[in-house]
């Protein structure tokens, strides 16, 4: 089972939530508050000290764009063609500043 850890707001996790929902994967939306975030940070549970993170059977993935790409691959949303795949990456990276 996958477990997406983020605050109870759309923010940097909403596109990930959509991709995970489209993937058909078994996943949990684990909302945390500020106190839980601080506790996870102090415990070293957040690889870069930030959320969102996606906890997988293979380990934890940090950084929203990396998680979105992972979820997109699970959902079959990432093109196999190298050019089209790069265009998808371009879109994801272009959305980051927003």
What is the predicted role of each segment?
Residues 1-98:
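GST-like domain detector, emphasizing the conserved glutathione-binding G-site
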């Amino acid at each position: 089972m996958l477990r997406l850890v983020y605050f109870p707001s759309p923010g940097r996790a909403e596109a990930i939530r959509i991709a995970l929902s489209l993937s058909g994967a078994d996943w949990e939306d684990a909302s945390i508050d500020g106190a839980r975030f601080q506790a996870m940070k102090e415990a070293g549970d957040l690889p870069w000290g930030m959320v969102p993170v996606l906890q997988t059977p293979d380990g934890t993935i940090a950084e929203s764009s990396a998680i979105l790409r992972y979820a997109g691959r699970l959902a079959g949303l990432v093109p196999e063609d190298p050019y089209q795949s790069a265009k998808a990456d371009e879109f994801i990276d272009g959305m980051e500043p927003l």
